[in-house]
A protein has these predicted regions:
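Secondary-structure transition/capping motifs at alpha-helix termini
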Residues: 3-6, 22-23, 93-102, 133-137
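Short, polar/flexible loop-turn hinges at active-site or ligand-entry regions and domain interfaces
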Residues: 5-7, 79, 120, 164-173
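Short, basic interhelical loop/turn and adjoining N-cap
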Residues: 2-14
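Active-site beta-loop-alpha junctions of metal-dependent nucleic acid enzymes
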Residues: 75-103
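Charged alpha-helix within mobile-element recombinases
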Residues: 135-180
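Mobile-element integrase/transposase regions
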Residues: 10, 17-73, 81-88
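Acidic/histidine-rich, metal-coordinating catalytic segments
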Residues: 100-119
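Two-metal-ion acidic nuclease core segments, chiefly of the RNase H-like superfamily
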Residues: 119-138
């Protein structure tokens, strides 16, 4: 008003009607890039890979760890995606990097989540033991919220492509693991 504009109730109503007719959302989601200090946070996920071991095609599961700060990636191959493989992969990773990060981030995997109670997720006994032994915390991502754990989602595909795009045939699982 102080700059000479004329504002009326009917003019404001007309403007609101035009905006609604254009189907312009009143608010849009915004994402803030997270910062994680080095070694503080690591994301975990499983991925599948089909390899030929001794001439026979087999399916393996890759346990992939990705540091949130550096995108440093580590992976191990397993025949099963079960609790034993989950715990063994963590032991391998923590030995490899010389300790455990402060926070491990998981999606909604059965080996980490025992049950859902409303929006809350209860950890499995294996995850509780792992967390207590290595003195690291854990966090679960929300369902269908890939931005909460985006590093490792891309890392599974990255590791699979870089490690196994040229060579798919190995004499043993150990040979395939060495390729990683």
């Amino acid at each position: 008003l102080s700059k000479g504009f004329k504002v009326s109730y009917s003019g404001v109503c007309k403007y609101i009607k035009e905006v609604k007719n254009k189907n312009i959302p009143s608010s849009q989601e915004a994402f803030i890039r997270g910062y994680h200090p080095p070694g503080e946070s690591c994301e975990f996920d499983w991925g599948e890979v089909k390899l030929y071991i001794g001439g026979k095609q087999q399916r393996f599961y890759m346990a992939v760890f990705t540091f949130s700060h550096s995108n440093g990636r580590y992976a191990w191959l397993f025949r099963h995606q079960n609790t034993l493989a989950f715990m063994e992969s963590h032991r391998n990773f923590f030995r490899e990097v010389g300790g455990a990060p402060s926070m491990m981030v998981y999606d909604n995997m059965r080996v980490a989540i025992k049950e859902f109670v409303g929006a809350e997720k209860k950890p499995t006994e294996a995850l509780l033991r792992l967390s207590n032994f290595y003195r690291c915390h854990y966090r679960f991502c929300n369902a269908r919220a890939g931005w909460e754990k985006g590093h490792v989602e891309r890392s599974v595909e990255y590791v699979r492509r870089k490690a196994f795009s040229v060579r798919l045939r190995f004499d043993s699982l150990e040979d395939a693991q060495n390729q990683l």
